[in-house]
Regions:
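Catalytic, metal-anchored helix/loop core of enzyme active sites in primary metabolism
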Residues: 1-325
Length: 325
């Protein structure tokens, strides 16, 4: 005779953090945005395997997160970072020349900066390859998401940001590649379906049979690649600059973006204003080192400090958005 499982509910702003700290085998953090930081830290402190889909918690926490994690405790769920994890098994860390992070290019691939000025929220919500929520879809249109993924890759795999190349791959079949120092490049290919990286995240390094459908190799497959237009889509290089500055700069990049995406979706700012205003907030943050809202170095990073910087960046981004409207 089957009996219903005992269950209970958790409510309140710290409910996800309390849940993440409970004994279990794996915690999959799929929260969107900086709200995922505390559940990520709670999971790591509990010694539980963390299947990380919330890239923002790693990006904003930086060393707070990486130093809290035991070797192998964090498993990437983003398709690109899952691809890196699979490809990196083909060689030693000291044999890696660079990581090649692929990008569909979003719905506005091929447009110049001038042609992006009149993009509407409705247009930005139409991604060519993936079906996702509002924030991540807009982030994929501005390529802020690719900037966050660049930072995540550097932190997860200990690779210098200058050794991570972003290339546009409209087919979304090659999820990322690793180039080794002998000239070999190892790639991970599969249809654009999150079932595979989620399955790997839950049972890494084992593979779950039939987790997703494979490519049909009897049909034509788009393996076209092209360089990223950093003039039209400046978010990736802005993220790289934040990562090189280290400390709290990536947290400011993320926090400002979250506010500005909302402002764009509400029609208060334009599409180009998102990345341009993030850059203004980042520049102000770096110039304020030693003052409230100013840059924290890696050694100065604390949870309270990061949260304070996050709050400052949100307030400043909202002020600049209001001035733009």
């Amino acid at each position: 005779e089957s009996r219903p499982l005992a269950s209970s509910g958790l409510v309140g702003p710290d409910a996800a953090t309390r849940l993440a700290a409970m004994p279990c085998d794996v915690v999959l953090n799929g929260i969107t945005g900086s709200a995922g930081l505390m559940p990520t830290l709670a999971t790591l402190e509990a010694g539980t395997t963390l299947a990380l889909a919330n890239k923002e918690s790693l990006v904003i926490g930086g060393r707070l997160v990486t130093e809290a994690a035991a070797p192998g405790q964090m498993v990437a769920v983003d398709s690109e970072h899952s691809a890196f994890a699979q490809c990196l098994r083909a060689g030693r860390a000291d044999e890696v020349r660079r990581l090649i992070l692929t990008c569909s290019g979003g719905p506005f691939r091929g447009r110049s900066r001038a042609e992006l000025a009149d993009v509407t929220p409705e247009q930005a919500m139409k991604h060519p390859s993936w079906d996702m929520g509002r924030v991540i879809t807009i982030n994929s249109s501005t390529l802020v998401n690719k900037g966050l993924e660049l930072l995540e890759a550097g932190l997860l795999y200990g690779v210098d940001l200058d050794d991570i190349t972003v290339v546009v791959h409209p087919g979304s079949v090659v999820h990322s590649m690793v180039e080794f120092h002998d000239g070999a490049t190892i790639a991970q290919l599969s249809p654009p379906d999150m079932k595979l990286p989620i399955a790997l995240g839950l049972d890494w390094p084992r593979r779950i049979a039939d987790a997703s459908k494979p490519n049909d190799w009897s049909a034509p497959v788009d393996l076209h690649f092209e360089p990223l237009d950093s003039d039209a889509f400046g978010a990736v290089e802005l993220a790289r600059r934040c990562g090189k500055a280290g400390g709290s700069a990536p947290a400011v990049f993320n926090a400002a973006n979250e506010v500005l995406v909302d402002a764009f979706c509400e029609g208060r700012i334009g599409f180009l204003d998102i990345t341009d205003t993030i850059a203004r907030v980042v520049d102000e943050h770096l110039a304020l080192a030693g003052q409230p809202g100013g840059h924290l170095s890696d050694d100065q990073m604390t949870v309270d400090g990061v949260l304070a910087v996050d709050a400052w960046a949100r307030t400043r981004a909202a002020e600049l958005a209001e001035a733009t409207a």
